[in-house]
Amino acid sequence: MDNHLAQGDPKTPDAMTNYARLADLPVTKCRDAAALAAQSFDAVVDALYGTGFHGSLRPAGLAACALMNRQRESGAFVLAVDLPSGINTDTGEAAEGAVRADLTVTFDSCKPLHTAPSSAPFCGEIVCADIGIRDEWHPAGLAQL
């Protein structure tokens, strides 16, 4: 199995720590977008942006999302981690070029974007994974799948 990392270097401390862990995994860092775009994949994992995303996609993010969407159009299965990149978690507003996933695996509970009419179609099937957060720690009115 080939794994490719298609976004630039991480900027936050947590992202830097996890990025360093890649040294022990079979991951190819691809800085040549044209070379990556020329390949076809059976599956794509979208973990580009997280719950803090808002506004428009930056040029590199827009290009990465476009690549994932083209791969999906060519038959690749797209799995989004927590949410498809390019969607505001709280409002469901989808930026131009947001990823369209076949499956979105979210953690603990459904977020507003998973049910908002503007963004739910981008999620595909939604699976909520239990990660052990106790019920009493949930805010009132939190949606559960």
Annotate each predicted stretch with a short phrase.
Residues 41-145:
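YjeF_N-associated NAD(P)HX repair module
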Residues 1-44, 49, 54-59:
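A cross-family phosphate/adenosyl-ligand binding-site feature
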